[in-house]
């Protein structure tokens, strides 16, 4: 079963698989954290498949000169995204919100020395994450029910908690979900097929 799931992941990246594997090996050798993955049997919750380092590398190139203070990863898994950007940005705060025990406890232990990183175990579909007034949100397909994910994105888009601008980064979200964001400024979109890729949006609340 595990082998079939891994094979399914590889097949989903098609012709970009060689590039994906290259960046996975590169950052693994650099000692980056968050390389664990697990498969979910809970309806609505996606497998914990870390965002490819290739995507993170490209996203970083695009946002490295954009100012933000608080980065929230909704569905943070084993912490790969937070670990990656914590090494790229100075003087930033990070919050990871994760539902599953295993991933949450892993992150709590492995990131405990970082005062600027906090992990919270909650169901992001019910949790009031807007209370933190974040100006950067990252979602790597945390939910496989479009209606629920669209509801979360609308909360972020319509948030009155943050009077400034918000950076919104979505990974591996399908086109039906992205339609609800067509009125936002799209900084960059990169997809290798219909389901695998990322989009970066800018919400200007000023």
Question: Where are these predicted regions, by residue range?
Answer:
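S-adenosyl-L-methionine
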Residues: 1-66
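Conserved SAM-binding loop
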Residues: 107-108
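Conserved SAM/SAH-binding beta-strand->alpha-helix loop
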Residues: 100
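Glycine-rich SAM-binding Motif I of class I
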Residues: 79-83
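Conserved SAM-binding strand-loop segment of SAM-dependent methyltransferases
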Residues: 114-123
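A short SAM/SAH-binding and catalytic strip from SAM-dependent methyltransferases
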Residues: 135-147
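C-terminal substrate-binding/active-site "lid" region of AdoMet-derived donor-dependent transferases
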Residues: 146-202
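Conserved class I S-adenosyl-L-methionine
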Residues: 68-77
């Amino acid at each position: 079963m595990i082998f079939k799931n891994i094979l399914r992941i590889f097949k989903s990246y098609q012709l970009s698989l060689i590039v994906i594997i290259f960046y996975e090996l590169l950052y693994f050798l650099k000692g980056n954290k968050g390389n664990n993955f697990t498969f979910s049997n809970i309806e609505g919750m996606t497998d914990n498949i870390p965002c490819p380092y290739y995507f993170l590398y490209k996203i970083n190139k695009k946002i490295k000169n954009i100012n933000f203070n608080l980065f929230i990863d909704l569905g943070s898994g084993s912490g790969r995204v937070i670990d990656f950007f914590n090494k790229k940005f100075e003087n930033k705060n990070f919050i990871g919100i994760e539902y599953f025990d295993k991933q949450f406890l892993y992150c709590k232990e492995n990131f405990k020395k970082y005062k600027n990183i906090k992990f919270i175990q909650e169901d992001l579909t019910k949790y009031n994450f807007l209370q933190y007034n974040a100006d950067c949100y990252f979602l790597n397909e945390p939910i496989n029910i479009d209606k629920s994910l669209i509801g979360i994105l609308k909360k972020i888009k319509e948030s009155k908690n943050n009077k400034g601008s918000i950076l919104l980064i979505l990974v591996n979200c399908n086109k039906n979900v992205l339609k609800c964001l067509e009125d936002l400024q799209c900084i960059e979109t990169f997809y290798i097929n219909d389901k695998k890729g990322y989009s970066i949006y800018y919400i200007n609340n000023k």
